[in-house]
């Protein structure tokens, strides 16, 4: 074997070792890219979770700090509770087979997180009312904070005390998410009242409550 042949073989072996190392490095880089992407996704998810929690905390703080008088609070509470009842009632209308297992709106909210069909129906109901999840979250927060002392006022009583509830909410509720949710509740109920005849518009709240079977 000549010196040139030996040198050529050694060079080929060296190139093969370099090629193997490059392939190994390429595999490692791909694994690092996957790890980086996973970490990025986890970071983004964590950031969104923190942002969502911060936004929810702000709504809670705003709901607790509302400067409404007792009468004003009851009027706003009346719109909120009527919208929540409407959402629950509509869900039961669309899911008659689940009436017994969905006795409250809270049960609907829990079930939709686990059941795709319930979630899709819930999304369609929100679309019907022109609501988004953040609106419902704001309304539920308001209800939790003030539900223990809130009193429902009928529509004619509300009009007698305050002519423009939306104006009052806009002026007094500074948190944008809470303000948007409350304003949307007023719009939904007022639009519904306009669509009803005078006799139906005087229906008491209990007639709006969905039937619940034992």
Swiss-Prot record:
Its main location: membrane. Disulfide bonds: none annotated. It is found in: Membrane. Keywords: Coiled coil, Membrane, Transmembrane, Transmembrane helix. One of its GO terms (cellular component) is membrane. It comes from the Eukaryota. It is a single-pass membrane protein. Pfam families: DUF4547 (PF15080). The chain crosses the membrane at residues 59-81. Residues 193-214 are annotated as: Disordered. Residues 5-40 form a coiled coil. PANTHER family: SINGLE-PASS MEMBRANE AND COILED-COIL DOMAIN-CONTAINING PROTEIN 1. This is Single-pass membrane and coiled-coil domain-containing protein 1.
């Amino acid at each position: 074997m000549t010196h040139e042949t030996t040198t050529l073989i050694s060079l080929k072996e060296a190139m093969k070792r370099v090629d193997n190392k490059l392939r190994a490095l390429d595999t490692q880089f791909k694994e690092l890219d996957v790890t980086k992407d996973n970490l990025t996704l986890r970071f983004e998810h964590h950031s969104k979770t923190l942002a969502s929690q911060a936004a929810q905390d702000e709504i809670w703080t705003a709901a607790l700090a509302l400067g409404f008088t007792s009468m004003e609070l009851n009027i706003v509470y009346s719109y909120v509770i009527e919208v929540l009842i409407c959402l629950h009632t509509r869900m039961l209308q669309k899911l008659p087979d689940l009436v017994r297992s969905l006795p409250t709106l809270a049960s609907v909210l829990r079930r939709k997180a686990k059941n795709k069909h319930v979630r899709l129906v819930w999304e369609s109901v929100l679309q019907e009312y022109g609501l988004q999840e953040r609106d419902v979250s704001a309304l539920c927060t308001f209800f939790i904070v003030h539900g223990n002392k809130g009193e429902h006022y009928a529509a004619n009583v509300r009009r007698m005390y305050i002519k423009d509830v939306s104006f009052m909410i806009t002026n007094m509720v500074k948190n944008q998410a809470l303000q948007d949710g409350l304003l949307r509740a007023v719009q939904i109920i007022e639009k519904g009242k306009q669509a009803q005849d005078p006799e139906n518009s005087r229906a008491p709240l209990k007639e709006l409550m969905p039937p619940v079977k034992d």
